[in-house]
Amino acid sequence: MLILTRRVGETLMIGDEVTVTVLGVKGNQVRIGVNAPKEVSVHREEIYMRIQAEKGTTPAAAPGNF
């Protein structure tokens, strides 16, 4: 796992087309914004796991590694 430190307003790039921006921090919560092409699915982990369970499949990656 790559661990990065970012401040509010700073962005990181994933590949050429996906950006993740830190929008705010309050206590132990971090608000992030994700910009990605429509063909790239972006889900919170618990939603992704629910989608996979409804499909009857298990995720190929370990939780948190997708």
UniProtKB/Swiss-Prot annotation:
Keywords: Activator, Cytoplasm, Repressor, RNA-binding, Translation regulation. InterPro entries: CsrA, CsrA_sf. It is found in: Cytoplasm. One of its GO terms (cellular component) is cytosol. SUPFAM superfamilies: CsrA-like (SSF117130). Its main location: cytoplasm. It comes from the Bacteria. A key translational regulator that binds mRNA to regulate translation initiation and/or mRNA stability. Mediates global changes in gene expression, shifting from rapid growth to stress survival by linking envelope stress, the stringent response and the catabolite repression systems. Usually binds in the 5'-UTR; binding at or near the Shine-Dalgarno sequence prevents ribosome-binding, repressing translation, binding elsewhere in the 5'-UTR can activate translation and/or stabilize the mRNA. Its function is antagonized by small RNA(s). Homodimer; the beta-strands of each monomer intercalate to form a hydrophobic core, while the alpha-helices form wings that extend away from the core. Belongs to the CsrA/RsmA family. This is Translational regulator CsrA. It comes from Aliivibrio salmonicida (strain LFI1238) (Vibrio salmonicida (strain LFI1238)).
